[in-house]
Amino acid sequence: MWNKGLSYSERHGLRNVGINKITNTKTGDTLNPDKNVSKHSLGLVFFPAFDWKISETHPERQERLLYTRDQIVEEGLLDIPNIREYNPIVADWDTIERVHVGAPDLESWVTEAHRVSAGGAIAAADAVMRGEVDRAFALVRPPGHHAMAMVHGIRGFCTINIEAVMIQHMRQKYGIKRVAVVDTDVHHGDGSQDVFYHDPDTLYISFHQDGRTLYPGTGFMDEFGGPQAIGGNIDIPLPPGTGDEGLMKVMRELVLPILEEFKPDIVINSAGQDNHFSDPLANMQVTAKGYAELVDLLQADIAVLEGGYSVQEALPYVNTGIILSMAGLDYSRVVEPAFDPVKYKQSQNVTTYIDDLIAKWKVQWANRHKMAEDERLGAGDVWSNHYNVYYDETGVQEERLEKVRMYEDKVGWHSVLSRGQYGPYGPQSVYAMFIPWQADDETRQDAIVEAKKAKAEGGASRYVVVDPLGKGQYEL
């Protein structure tokens, strides 16, 4: 069974610090492990969803993981002792509905493939939480990190947030509290940010290509967490051309120190792979070996595949490197045939930009408590925010009014009045009251009173309450 009593650093007393070298942080001894011996037991869950696609020519199509599966089998990774394969399960509607509210409903958008993809992440989590393996990697699709709590269709290839559904399952079944999600996809995970933005016990860290140059156009330093969770959202927008050197610098100098301070019970890697130099949708220069070293540094408990669309030139090699790294095996010989060390060398301008960005982030992180205090003083009893969300795959323009109940000493509810236009189901309006998973009876009752008040005032066709560790989702 998972040992919840140890901190992040304590649970990773053995921290990988380089290719084929392990340093014990308690003794300082450096070990040179046998390259054929897995240092960590690893569970693998595959769900390639060969029957699901957005279109025949879309990047998110059936054969996306075909070559990856072939590579893993040909390399004999499934024959290595301590690497076990698990079957995915079908995520149940109750768990999904404790995270998401759909317009007109979730059934209109969520297919069985989406439920099995989320179920693959859940199967990986179960394997770790039951103590059957040290770590697990869910190689599943469709992806999920652009899916927000409100769902008006597909956006950024995502419909439901598979990591969020997995974390909900872990909190509900195993009592996990403090969670860190480190998103290494090239696109900012605006959906994961949305789901966790008001939760001070979930740290979301995303380093991605600068949103001024890439979809979804978000993910900047001022997106620092909601008014009751300042410092809980860390967006690190990296310049096009960032390579292995830049990612390692961000990991060592910024991400790892923040994780040490946050002290999560568990670390999740949203393992997007479209930072790769060959990916057709982005402009970065990361290699398969760079991804493996990143995983080596992070020491995540669970990894869940997100993006990555260089189906033949990147994914087979990147996933091989990640598996070897998570298992504590040598990954030094994982090299893509198309790799050119001269062509894909990070420029000095990019390095200087990243140095400056890290310096700014260190100042902001150090000032987070003062920023949180100022935010609370300025918010009053109820904080509100008005903004729009666009669904690129379904053409829906969503308008949102969000409110957060501010308490001095606990996490309050947040509500969303969502109105969607131009979608296939016509205009949709939904009011959703999200009760925090940490809620006590007073908070829960306040939330229900507020939701009933909103219903009496009108303005939506549906009124929904989401109580993640209580009754689940229900209509008023």
Model-predicted segments: where are they?
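HDAC/HDAC-like amidohydrolase catalytic core signature
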Residues: 24-476
